[in-house]
Regions:
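Residues forming the flavin
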Residues: 1-205
Length: 205
């Protein structure tokens, strides 16, 4: 029996010159600051299509850095977005990064409003920044489940593949199974762990 909890990988979002030094994943920027005390920039622009990048923005704000968030969504609402608003973090909804600008490193970005159907851009603006922190949501790390012969399936809600029907004695939990709530992850992991223990020992404890 194998309990797989291999996590997930943050996706980038593609735009012009996104290989310019200073373009980083939002989660990496947060970890550098929170764990190592390293700032990836003093004028961060955060480009996202989901809530997780707001954690990065909040971490910047706690360290007296004022980020600007560009969110592709029209009117997203959640607890973490409300928290960011209450902290005075600047946000632009229905906005995208068109291109990073700068030669040896990012020094600005071309941004634009995007239509509701995501097909048309408004007037392109230029905004000063020294880094662009990107989050295109998370892709479950399904490699171990897939290699075991598990027939994966596509989850439209998260736009990613997750483990489907198990072929060997493997069980996948947490974000590797498309569950991104810590509470739900812990609950299901304990449940599956208990089931496996009961199966192996024939004891219900």
């Amino acid at each position: 029996e194998v309990l797989i909890s291999s996590g997930s990988i943050e996706r980038p979002i593609v735009f012009g010159n996104n290989d310019t030094p200073g373009v980083v994943l939002a989660s990496a920027a947060k970890e550098y600051l929170k764990v190592y005390g390293v700032l990836v920039g003093k004028k961060p622009l955060i480009f996202t299509n989901n809530d997780s990048a707001y954690e990065t923005a909040i971490e910047f704000k706690k360290n007296n850095i004022n980020p600007i968030i560009l969110d592709t969504r029209k009117n997203p609402e959640s607890e973490i977005i409300s928290e960011a608003k209450n902290m005075g973090i600047e946000m632009k909804f229905s906005y995208v990064v068109v291109a990073a600008k700068g030669y040896k490193k990012v020094n600005s970005a071309e941004i634009a409003n995007i239509s509701e159907d995501k097909k048309d851009l408004g007037k392109i603006e230029n905004i000063t920044c020294d880094c662009i922190c990107v989050s295109g949501f998370w892709t479950p790390t399904i490699h171990l489940a897939s290699q075991s012969g598990n027939k994966t399936k596509f989850n439209e809600e998260i736009d990613a593949f997750i483990p489907g029907k198990s072929k060997q004695n493997e069980t996948t939990v947490g974000s590797a199974n498309g569950i991104f709530s810590l509470e739900k992850t812990l609950t299901t992991a304990f449940e599956k762990g208990h089931e496996i223990s009961k199966k192996l020992t024939n004891k219900d404890n």
